[in-house]
Amino acid sequence: TDSVENDLVTAAFMEALSKDGLEAGGTVHLSSTIPVARGLGSSAAAVLAGIDLALAVRGLPEDRDAAFCAAYEHEGHGDNAAPCLFGGLRAVLPGAIRPLVTKLELSDMIGFAYAAPPAGISTI
């Protein structure tokens, strides 16, 4: 993937480890088919990959709710992190303690089309 996405994976990984006072080094090779800077959640996917990698390094089980909260805190884009983790169309609302994620139902009569612009636009 793009080096910016790699930086997001690394930053989220290091941030997740640092919460437990840990550090790590090494090389990670990754790839993604999500177009970068096109509004499809590549940044959220990169952040979540870093968080999941930190869990794996520590030997901890996946915790989707905790991963979502960490991604929301790290990036602030719950609208992309929620569908990335939980699938489907999701609404994300700020909560007193943690963001509230709600699944939204879609009619089968609704179709989607997407055309990626030739130039990327950062949403961070």
Predicted features along the sequence, with ranges:
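Generic structural motif recognizing short loop/turn segments at the entrances and edges of beta-strands
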Residues: 24-26, 39-41, 88, 97-100
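Predominant activation on well-ordered alpha-helical scaffold segments within soluble catalytic domains
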Residues: 10-14, 48-55, 68, 72
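Gly/Ser-rich catalytic serine loop of serine hydrolases
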Residues: 33-45, 79
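Surface-exposed beta-strand edges and their flanking turn/coil or helix-capping segments
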Residues: 6, 41-43, 106
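ATP-dependent small-molecule kinase catalytic core of the GHMP/sugar-kinase superfamily
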Residues: 62-124
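DPxDG-like acidic metal-binding loop motif
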Residues: 40-62, 85-90
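ATP-binding N-lobe of GHMP and related small-molecule kinases
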Residues: 1-38, 56, 60-62
